[in-house]
Every structure is written in structure tokens, then in C-alpha cells.
């Protein structure tokens, strides 16, 4: 073992009554009840809206959003997942974290005419319009539980960007249209009711 590697922890569980299987099960459950510094998996197919609560640390929440985008792009082909990000370009933390996503091929429309990155409300309208065009046929389809070849992940640094926009009806819809929305909020009460 080299000097810099840390030894692994070994948990030894002592069963009071070795004949009773619930004793060991409860000890295992209690030993691993709280896990710290481990990756958390999110199945976007199961969740249409996800909230990232900053709890006063907005920079940390934006960083989580950026890391999610990078991991989604790294693990999925740009033809399978399209990423869209809407942020406030006037806020340095948001702009420095999310603006570089524009270089990902995942952030382009399939016809390569629209980049799904917006730093202002006007740019957001263009992104929302293009996404709405893509999702309209899916929404109007009579089929339920359809698996889509392309999924769209919409990342918002504020839920207010959705107000008055057509895409809000797709975000709020219970119908699966292949749209997954991740919203950053300062507290749980700032998230939409659907989260």
C-alpha cells in the first residue's frame, strides 16, 4: 500500500441473535443509513422535473447544474439527448458555469440552426419556441408510454423564465413528451408544485 492511499473501512456486524436474520439486516441498514460523499444517481426517464435547492449557496447549486450537464453529455450521444440551458448572463456565477456548454454538440437543434443556450429572456424565448416545435407532435400524439429516440433536458437557473411561455405547458404536463426539466431554486418553497 503506497503512502498516499487511504485504508478502506471494514464494518464488522455483531449479531446478538445469529439465528434471527432481521438482526443483521437492521444492523446493515443502520450502518449505511447515511452515506456521505458518494455519487447520487438520477434516472431522468422516471422524473420529468428535478429541483436543485441552493440553500443559500447559489454558486454550489449552479455548479451541480453544470456537473449534471457535463455528465449527461459525457454519457449520452448528442443524437440521443439534447441539452438546453437558460441562465442570467449578467450573473457572473451563472454565465461562467453555463455559457461554456454552448460548445457541446448536445446543445444544438437537430437541424443545427438553433443553439439551446440562452443568457437572457429574449434568447430564452427563441430556445423555448424551437423546443416547443419539437415537442408539439409528441404532446398531441394519442400514444402513451412512448419511448423517444431523443430526450430533451432543460436546465433553468430560475423558474420565472417559464412564466408566459408555451413550453411551460409541456413542462407541467403529466404526459411523457421526452422533456426533463432541472430547476435551481433558493429554497424548496421556490420550486414549482410539480417537483
What do these predicted ranges mean?
Residues 1-195:
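Accessory regions of macromolecular translocation/handling assemblies
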